[in-house]
Regions:
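Eukaryotic N-terminal, low-complexity and coiled-coil-prone scaffolding/targeting segments
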Residues: 1-23, 29, 33-39, 50-58, ...
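Extended HEAT/HEAT-like alpha-solenoid repeat tracts in very large eukaryotic scaffold/adaptor proteins
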Residues: 19-23, 62, 134-152, 169, ...
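Intrinsically disordered, low-complexity regions enriched in proline, serine, glycine
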Residues: 17-18, 36, 59, 78, ...
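Alpha-solenoid repeat junctions
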Residues: 27-31, 70, 100-103, 153, ...
Length: 246
């Protein structure tokens, strides 16, 4: 299987086309027969293929192949994607949105929600390990998961699932906001966020999640009361939490 996927990087159109057809057929019919230890390599090769082309048809093929592989091996594929590169990379954003729009969207959101919850518990239990690894590396995983979660939520068709997962999403994201307030992040990790405040990514994720669950009038009220700005400000964080709890 790996040798076939590697041939996708071939510059000869006929060879690449044949490899694409074979790969989709194999993944659709025999994807479950792929050993899990091979999945990370396949994901890496497919992602390399995606980044190397701007051709619409070829990019559609890669996204379809990732979907088929995720259908057979959801957890290994998600883990590989989360470790692939910067989550704000435009190609990675396209991958997450493609999966979010697919029939796997609900399953993927459930998995990402659980991963965010587990990441929060893990970081709380292993403060000494965090110091050894460095704050930037320790902070990377929750941010990567949250970036992926935001892309999936933004395109997910079923709002009811977001509502059902809210009891897990809300405390998980709030915990990350609380833990990151006041931290001095390394530039490589700080660049993952568009704003200056360390917790801005998680606050934006909270706003996005609640936008899929609440009526517009409640969202407008939260904005008017300054809930999001308060959450991201260390001295006003508790006020922001109280506004959400009302």
């Amino acid at each position: 299987m790996s040798s076939i996927v590697e041939s996708l990087l071939c510059t000869r159109p006929v060879c690449a086309w044949a490899a694409e057809r074979w790969t989709l057929t194999f993944l659709g019919d025999c994807g479950e027969q792929i050993f899990q230890e091979e999945v990370p390599k396949l994901v890496h090769l497919l992602y390399t293929c995606l980044r190397s082309t701007r051709q619409s048809a070829r990019r559609c093929f890669v996204l379809r192949a990732v979907f088929l592989l995720a259908h057979s091996h959801p957890q290994p594929v998600l883990d590989s994607l989360l470790q692939a590169c910067l989550p704000t990379d435009s190609d990675m954003v396209e991958v997450w949105r493609s999966l979010g729009r697919s029939v796997l969207g609900c399953q993927i959101l459930v998995c990402l929600t659980e991963k965010l919850r587990a990441a929060g518990k893990s970081s709380h239990r292993s403060e000494c390990c965090t110091r050894e690894l460095g704050s930037s590396q320790a902070a990377l995983e929750p941010r990567t998961i949250t970036h992926a979660l935001c892309e999936v939520v933004s395109v997910l068709q079923r709002k009811t699932l977001v509502q059902r997962l809210l009891p897990s999403l809300l405390p998980g994201l709030l915990r990350q906001v609380s833990e990151t307030l006041g931290e001095e992040l390394a530039p490589s990790v700080g660049d993952l966020e568009s704003a200056d405040m360390p917790g801005s990514l998680f606050v934006a994720a909270l706003e996005l999640v609640l936008a899929r669950c609440l009526d517009n009038r409640w969202l407008r009220l939260l904005r008017e009361q300054g809930a999001w700005a308060s959450l991201a400000e260390p001295r006003a964080h508790s006020t922001g939490v109280c506004l959400l709890a009302r």
